[in-house]
Amino acid sequence: MKRLAKAAFSQNSLTAPIVSTFVYLISVVRVVLNGNWPVTSSDTAMFQHIGWMVFSGKRYYIDAWDPKPPLTLELATIIAYISNGDPHLQHTLSVVSTIVAGILLTYLISHITSEITGNQFAGLLSGIVFITFPVIHYSAVFGYEPKYFVFLFGLGSIYLSRNPKPILSGAAAAASAGMWQFAIIFPIISFGIISRRKSKDLILKYVFGATIIAFISLLPIYLQGGLVAMTVEVIIAPLYAGETQSFLYRLVKGVTHLKLMIPIALLGMAGILLGFLDDIRERWWVVGLLLWFCIQIFILDYDGADDLFLGIILVSMGIGFAFEKLSTKYESERINSIVTAVVVCMLIWQVVTLGGVGVITNPYSYSGDGPDQAILESGIQQFAHLSGYTEYTIGGSPPDEQYNVKSRYGPDKIEELFFTSTIPSTCHYRLSGMELEWMNLTEQSFTEEKCGKWRLP
């Protein structure tokens, strides 16, 4: 067992990303062997389709309603241009780019934990635990998933602030927030780390880096005349048409998504709190991220298991912190051997059986049996169930008009639109719960060709 601990889990900082590479490849092979390739979720297909639409001459936010900040859609467009508009090549490149981001994120988690604890094995453990969560290693197979890039840039901004490299840190923080509204915590924390050095020069460089990325991301939107549409869909609509689920509903959903990983999650959170008490000055930002994650999940945004991403990162780091506490209290070699055995078993179980948890983040079962109709419930049905509206109270559209739109569009039709290179006749074709609620509040029609007009409920 000691040899296993020293060889398979050596002190090499590249061990975790190397292991994660093999895990991602296993997930890809699983999908290919099941005959499901190419496969997407409604979200990944939507991002990729918008990227292809812009490549084909359409405009962000105007020709396709979407609440994601611009960098998410612009990166999808870059991939569409690289693939020259071929949807199958675009999808493959999207999977590859997402996996690469996941591998780099694994390295970053491992490296930062090692740096904080001064224990490389603790860092290695954090990286391995991160990749054992099925939602992490399996979601990347479904195409372009922005969350991997969001947290790669976000965690990168914190790492660069700690070193410090203020221009790069500011740029990375802005890129993170430019892909997901709730990543705004990363500019706040990374700026806080920079500010503690009490250097005006560092602060100005940080602001400069952030400004450059903000300018680059907003310029295409401005040139397309989409700033108003972006403001409405990215900022105003989520404020008025956000989620309304109860605390208990969200808690049960979290338990459902985590299942067998609940003990690991609890241990990781305990590790974060213990580490914080040991070194408040060094680890305050970890607790800050944990508090923000709780606000996000229980109040602001928890649509699916991919919204647990930040929590999984923090739990993984917390496991490293917990190991550090154990290794200082007990004999290090014995602890290394025991932890290695547990982690290897957990890794094999989570990768081979996907934790035995079934569907997590996408409309396909892990067994490869095809679409799960319970997951493929249309956005209109979801909205009606959650809010109490009937099918025909959405916007100002008559029933026959709504029926015609629903028969061609919706969450379960996005994949077909993407792979057949189809341009929808309406800008409202995703028909997510938020989109439908916004349409109802502002009395928009299902057949509108252009979205993003300045409207308030």
From Swiss-Prot:
User: Its principal location?
Assistant: membrane
Q: Which GO terms describe its cellular component?
A: plasma membrane
- Entry keyword annotation includes Secreted: no
Does the keyword field hold Methyltransferase? no
| Gene Ontology annotations of biological process type | S-layer organization
Question: Listed GO molecular functions?
Answer: dolichyl-phosphate-mannose-protein mannosyltransferase activity
Its domain of life reads: Archaea
Record-listed E.C. numbers: 2.4.1.-
Its membrane topology is listed as:
Multi-pass membrane protein
InterPro entries annotated for this entry? AglS
Q: What does this protein do?
A: Involved in the assembly of a N-linked pentasaccharide that decorates the S-layer glycoprotein and flagellins. Transfers mannose, the terminal pentasaccharide residue, from its dedicated dolichol phosphate carrier to the protein-bound glycan comprising the first four subunits of the N-linked pentasaccharide.
Can you say what this protein is called? Dolichol phosphate-mannose mannosyltransferase
